[in-house]
């Protein structure tokens, strides 16, 4: 969220506890972090406190539990969180959260296998209070790496939100990949689909590196609307297509 004219405070405390006498367990990392934003008039716009414990195993796997988040959102104007959702009266329409201060709590659990292995899996879930209601958001990802040339990953996030003003669900699916032809030439791709907006976005980048991060970069961006009619009344089809070619060169002017 972009902010202007605000006061801000943040902090973090982390402790590493090694267990030398246990072969299969590496370390325990309890920690707490947080931040808070105020307007110049003293209104608390938001705060976030995160309390968690990470259990790191010798085989590279980790478990984070139980994470506990304390969150707060201050709204000095109504906030439309959804263009269309299920309203309490059984109809469909925009979901608008009224003015107020919302203090919430949520729990989270995260686990992953060894991320440096050729094949790794990550999964987690967050659930708890959200504005005037509740939210649950499980997610998962699978990553594959072949030597130092190929890396791929597929992930999915799901959000189930139930508020006094209405309810909705959203899914986000993402596929990423990177292939290195040589240490200086690579191809990267990022595909993302949001079932809320019905948009399929893609970003493809070809890089041919020179010294100090310079070189040739070719980037193609594309957004396709896969629904019937979007909120502006347009039918399915392309929404954005962009091709960017950039070349930079570093010169030594001192001879």
Region spans (language model):
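Exposed, low-structure sequence patches enriched in small/polar residues
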Residues: 1-255
């Amino acid at each position: 969220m972009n902010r202007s004219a605000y006061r801000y405070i943040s902090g973090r405390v982390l402790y590493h506890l090694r267990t030398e006498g246990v072969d299969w367990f590496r370390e325990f990392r309890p920690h707490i972090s947080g931040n808070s934003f105020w307007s110049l008039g003293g209104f608390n716009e938001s705060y976030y406190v995160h309390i968690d414990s990470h259990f790191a195993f010798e085989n590279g796997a980790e478990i984070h539990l139980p994470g506990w988040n304390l969150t707060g959102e201050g709204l000095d104007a109504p906030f439309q969180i959804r263009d269309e959702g299920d309203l309490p009266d059984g109809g469909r329409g925009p979901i608008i959260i009224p003015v107020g201060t919302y203090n919430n709590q949520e729990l989270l659990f995260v686990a992953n296998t060894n991320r440096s292995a050729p094949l790794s899996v990550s999964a987690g879930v967050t659930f708890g209070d959200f504005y005037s209601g509740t939210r649950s958001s499980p997610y998962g990802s699978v990553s594959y790496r072949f030597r130092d040339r190929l890396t791929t990953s597929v992930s999915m996030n799901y959000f189930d939100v139930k508020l006094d003003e209405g309810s909705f669900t959203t899914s986000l699916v993402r596929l990423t990949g990177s292939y290195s032809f040589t240490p200086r030439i690579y191809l990267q791709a990022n595909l993302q689909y949001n079932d809320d907006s019905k948009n399929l976005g893609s970003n493809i980048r070809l890089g041919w590196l020179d010294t100090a991060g310079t070189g040739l970069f070719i980037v193609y961006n594309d957004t396709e609307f896969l629904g019937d009619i979007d909120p502006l009344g347009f039918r399915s089809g392309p929404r954005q297509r962009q091709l960017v070619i950039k070349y930079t060169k570093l010169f030594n002017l001192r001879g």
